[in-house]
Amino acid sequence: MYILGLSAMGHDSAAALLGDSGIVAAMEESKLARTRASEGIPREAIRYCLERAGIRWRDVVYVAIASRPWRAWQRQASFRARLAPLAPVSSGYFVNKASGELGRELNNVRIVRQMAGAPEGRVESLDHHLCHAASAFYASAFERALVVSLDEKGDGRAGFVGIGEGTGLREVQSLTLPHSLAWVYSQVTKLLGFRPHADEHKTQWLSICGEGGGDADSGAAAVKGAAAGAPSVAAGAPAFTELFLEMLRREPRGPAHLNAKYFRSGFAGELSFTHEFYRRAGIAQEPAENTPETRVPEPLRVRIATGLQRACEIILCEWLTALREEFKERSLCLAGGLYLNPLLVAAIEARVGFENVFVQPAAGNEGTALGAAYYLWHRQCGRARIAAMPGPYWGPAYSNEEIKKVLDNCKAAYHWCDSDEGKLGEAVRLLQAGKIMAWFQGAAEFGPRALGARSLLASPWAPYVKENLNDYVKHRESFRPFALAIPEERCGEYFECSPNGRFLTTMAKANGAGRRLLEGLPPGFLLHGNLVRLHVVHAADNPLFWKLLNRAGENAPAPLLVNTSFNLFGEPLVVTPRDAVRSYFCSGADALVAGNFLLEKR
């Protein structure tokens, strides 16, 4: 039996296929269509899933769509009705806009029904947050857990709290708009000059720059002054933490309750800030024709980002602690775009007190495709619980013959390695020489992170490794840290890391030996509080990458490699051999190992 799950209504569309053996295939549309944050029906991802299973539409018993358009419209309409007295001019615009979105989404459901050939392949629409929650609980190894989903406004609400037990998943709390931490995080991201719904990770890493910086005493004084009517709290990050805590007033039934003193509804229905926020933050009122970067000076950007991150950690940790005490659960499952924040996940693991925490690696909207399929599999079909998610490698894989056809077509010069050992030896030679190596092996990752199948690798001991990666390959902001990869068996020698390090969804902490090791590396790998971005590689998940790490560590202080995503700036992760060749030749990478083929630039 096969069930196809789809994220087909908002950004980050994707498809996932479940069969009797478990997950068969899963892939984001953006990686196959080569566009960022693809929306709508994931036609290429659907085609891939069916091809990987060797089936046709008629073999799919159910199609599960991770959205309920009518229910989302009703929630949005109710939300806007409550806001109408505050923004009467925009209410009519919103009704037209929401009605247009509803029409498009209902049309997408109709098209999927036609593609599936219903009634042979039945199509079910499921709640967005329910699918997030299902993607986390059913992929975990827990028999019972508290399950929490938080994102911006999926299907017209901010979040979901449920209890998962066996094959069951029931809702115990619904979080309503506009009280959405993720929504606020996106709007602050926009304020800082980044793209909302795309660059929230930049806000997160910018916040690290403010940790340990600034003067806590002057920040506290600024808060006291602001309470007395002073014009600004811009003296330091602690002051902004207090400001955001005031803006995101905590209340018992949710992680936040937005203070209307600081928020307003824009003409198009988006969340925006009031004049009072700009006054308290010490920045100019938002002009109609300007960019945030010209408005917010760099020191303020860091303090705002740091204050927001700290406030979110405080609010969520206190709320999740209250939920743990209320429901008496020992395990926690998390999904939703807000949990793509490893700093936040690490804070939850350290402070909340759950014995076990699992974060769905594809925590964004793409993961709802998997959750929709999981939910129908267990609840609609009554099938037994599928084993815990065995890894993220559910995308396309390519044979050496397929790779060779592309290389020959591109007239690329290459060297053939006749065994895995030979390939590993060549790769280690390149890494020890300080080269940046593109690594294209096996099935592509499902989810936003490169986990050793579509990666750019380098030795962390190579001179100027961060500068070379940033300037010649990634072309990204210098404040963003790179991840390190280490074999699971060696991790405990240097780091403390939860099982979520397997998917790069949390932060590790360097112990004494780890601090001494990383202090010998260029700045930026060891972060404030001894935190490290760490990919813990299990031999069962990715045996070839695990072997490479161990081989690379034979003549190095430790089996560590820098691991970052293999893609050009502004593009999704590479998937196909042609993607890999194009990205390799258009970047400053020194070498490409694709299958058993080695390409080097001279």
Describe the predicted segments one by one.
Residues 63-66, 335, 360, 595:
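Conserved residues at the C-terminal ends of beta-strands
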Residues 56-109, 134-135:
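Short beta-strand-loop/turn "lid" adjacent to the catalytic site in phosphate-handling enzymes
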Residues 98-102, 123-126, 294, 298-314, ...:
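Short acidic-aromatic active-site loops that bind/stabilize oxyanions
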Residues 31-55:
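N-terminal phosphate-binding loop and adjacent alpha-helix
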Residues 2, 8-28, 33-36, 86-88, ...:
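Flexible beta->alpha loop and helix N-cap segments adjacent to enzyme active/binding sites
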Residues 44-53, 63-67, 548, 556:
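Short HxH-centered metal-ligating active-site micro-motif
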Residues 47-61, 116, 320-328:
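Phosphate/pyrophosphate-binding loops at sites that engage ATP/ADP/AMP, CoA/4′-phosphopantetheine
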Residues 306-332:
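Phosphate/ATP-binding catalytic cores across multiple sugar-kinase/actin-like superfamilies
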